[in-house]
């Protein structure tokens, strides 16, 4: 049977192949996030195109692997999950170096770094000169930065760490082989802010003993983002590196502005941010950005070994799927949702006799007092919220107890300060939160709180007395089905 595929169809086939190749080659030449997002079919085509460049996937030759690592994968499912990109990125000792037998994987790594830089430029950090995507969590990425600076500062023993009650950033210092000099925040009305004077005094006293100052831009309220502009000026004046822990700070326009201003007025050596918290990809990667290419190159050279390409792959696919046209939408939506969340939480707090902490520079996290719940019952309330499917919210109870992390003792760990308080509830509006989630959050919070307070009142009555606790009777509370 003769084929009916004629000259016209053949021309069309060649045109399709040519347009596909043109699209892929254009992407590689420009190395920028495309204007419009790609379809899933095109993303599959892109991955196949990349993997065809690795020697173990070549179709024009039969490779004979004679080394200890040849991209061999035993399980077909695992191979498909990795889209045949099995070599990883970098070479032993440098994440930026090209792997000759893994050209496609190396191209993927290059695109992820260039896309990351482009993304930061779109967000407002236009003076960033270089970026690297690493298959490490935020804490390990901070540790990698500090490790890379060891030779530059051979007398260094310490890192100034502005207290943020989140374990991984503190552990990153000790993992890199240094000790933390802990600076407690100071109180500015409701907010906990940077003690700039103490940092300046320590920098003046310690000098060459300091590896760097680590600041934090994203945190749970009432902790405020650090004053990185003032710290960068101190670091520049005394020639001390400045490491910024910007875990999920890319979601905040104010944080972006502060990072850019800190670079302009002082010194910022590296800025580390989480991929999953900012770009909605699976956990496992971080983005290290620098305002000098040499800063990022030295960090890349400190990585001991070859690295997984999975975080780079996920980030590239996400940016290609969005395109520039849709890239900023989640960030703009987060800003709107945060303002809406703050209004709702303020209204709820007023209804139940509580108040929301005023931390104007924190554009992601909120804190509400829990004065109507006895301190001994506050963590139970947090458990009730979790059992109702409210994840991520946390209750912080004031405590005199000490918590030891890496040999450092903290009073009232979780509160970012040793100061005592009446307990509070933290909730956050992170990127990707939808309107229906916010509405459901407050529906569940409202009903859970009302039932919890009524139950406490019943317990008081059974004990033969009343604590005088206010039982909210607002119409919006579901008073049925205790």
UniProtKB/Swiss-Prot annotation:
Positions of the UniProt region annotated as Disordered: 461-482
Cofactor(s), names only, from the UniProt record: pyridoxal 5'-phosphate
Region feature (Phosphate loop (P-loop))? 90-100
User: Which keywords does UniProt give here?
Assistant: Cytoplasm, Protein biosynthesis, Pyridoxal phosphate, RNA-binding, Selenium, Transferase, tRNA-binding
Region of interest: Tetramerization: 1-36
Q: What's the main place this protein lives?
A: cytoplasm
Q: What is its EC number?
A: 2.9.1.2
Any idea which positions bind pyridoxal 5'-phosphate? 69
What catalytic activity is recorded? Answer: O-phospho-L-seryl-tRNA(Sec) + selenophosphate + H2O = L-selenocysteinyl-tRNA(Sec) + 2 phosphate
The GO annotation for biological process reads: conversion of seryl-tRNAsec to selenocys-tRNAsec; selenocysteine incorporation
Q: Where does substrate bind?
A: 91-92, 99, 306
Q: Which GO terms describe its molecular function?
A: identical protein binding; O-phosphoseryl-tRNA(Sec) selenium transferase activity; tRNA binding
Q: At which residues is there a site annotated May act as a substrate filter by repelling compounds with a negatively charged alpha-carboxylate?
A: 68
Report the residues modified as N6-(pyridoxal phosphate)lysine: 277
Enzyme class, top EC level, equals: transferase
Indicate yes or no for the key word Iron.
no
Family matches, as Pfam families: SepSecS (PF05889)
By sequence similarity, the record places it as follows: Belongs to the SepSecS family.
Q: How does it assemble?
A: Homotetramer formed by a catalytic dimer and a non-catalytic dimer serving as a binding platform that orients tRNASec for catalysis. Each tetramer binds the CCA ends of two tRNAs which point to the active sites of the catalytic dimer.
Q: What is this protein called?
A: O-phosphoseryl-tRNA(Sec) selenium transferase
Q: Which gene encodes it?
A: secs-1
């Amino acid at each position: 049977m003769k084929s009916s595929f004629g000259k016209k169809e053949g021309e069309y086939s060649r045109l399709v192949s040519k347009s596909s190749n043109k699209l892929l080659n254009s992407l590689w030449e420009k190395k920028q996030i495309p204007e419009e997002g790609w379809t899933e079919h095109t993303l599959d085509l892109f991955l196949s195109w990349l993997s065809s460049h690795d020697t173990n996937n070549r179709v024009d030759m039969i490779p004979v692997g004679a080394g200890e690592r040849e991209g061999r994968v035993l399980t077909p499912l695992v191979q498909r999950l990795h889209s045949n990109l099995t070599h990883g990125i970098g070479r032993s000792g440098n994440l930026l170096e090209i792997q000759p037998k893994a050209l496609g994987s190396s191209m993927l790594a290059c695109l992820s770094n260039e896309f990351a830089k482009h993304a930061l430029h779109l967000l407002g950090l236009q003076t960033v000169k270089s970026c690297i995507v690493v298959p490490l969590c935020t804490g390990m990425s901070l540790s990698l930065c500090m490790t890379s600076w060891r030779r530059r500062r051979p007398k260094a023993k310490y890192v100034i760490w502005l207290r943020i009650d989140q374990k991984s950033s503190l552990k990153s210092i000790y993992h890199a082989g240094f000790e933390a000099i802990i600076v407690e925040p100071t109180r500015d009305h409701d907010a906990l802010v940077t003690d700039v004077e103490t940092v300046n005094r320590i920098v003046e006293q310690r000098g060459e003993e300091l590896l760097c100052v680590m600041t934090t831009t994203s945190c749970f309220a009432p902790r405020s983002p650090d004053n990185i502009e003032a710290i960068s000026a101190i670091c520049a004046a005394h020639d001390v590196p400045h490491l910024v822990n910007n875990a999920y700070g890319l979601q905040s326009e104010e944080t972006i502005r502060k990072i850019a201003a800190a670079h302009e007025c002082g010194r910022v050596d590296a800025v580390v941010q989480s991929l999953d918290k900012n770009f909605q990809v699976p956990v496992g990667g971080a983005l290290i950005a620098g305002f000098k290419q040499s800063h990022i190159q030295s960090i890349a050279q400190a990585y001991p070994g070859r690295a997984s390409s999975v975080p780079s792959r996920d980030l590239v696919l996400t940016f290609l799927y969005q395109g520039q046209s849709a890239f900023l939408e989640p960030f703009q939506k987060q800003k709107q949702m945060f303002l809406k969340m703050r209004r709702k939480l303020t209204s709820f707090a007023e209804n139940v006799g509580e108040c929301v902490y005023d931390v104007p520079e924190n554009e992601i996290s909120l804190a509400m007092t829990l004065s109507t719940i006895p301190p001994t019952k506050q963590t139970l309330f947090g458990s009730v919220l979790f059992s109702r499917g409210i994840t991520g919210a946390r209750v912080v109870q004031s405590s005199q107890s000490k918590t030891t992390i890496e040999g450092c003792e903290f009073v009232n760990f979780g509160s970012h300060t040793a100061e005592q308080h009446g307990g509070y509830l933290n909730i956050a509006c992170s990127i990707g939160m939808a309107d229906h989630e916010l509405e459901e959050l407050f529906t569940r919070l409202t009903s859970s709180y009302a039932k919890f307070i009524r139950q406490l009142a019943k317990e008081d009555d059974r004990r033969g007395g009343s604590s005088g606790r206010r039982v909210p009777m607002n119409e919006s509370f579901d008073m049925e089905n205790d």
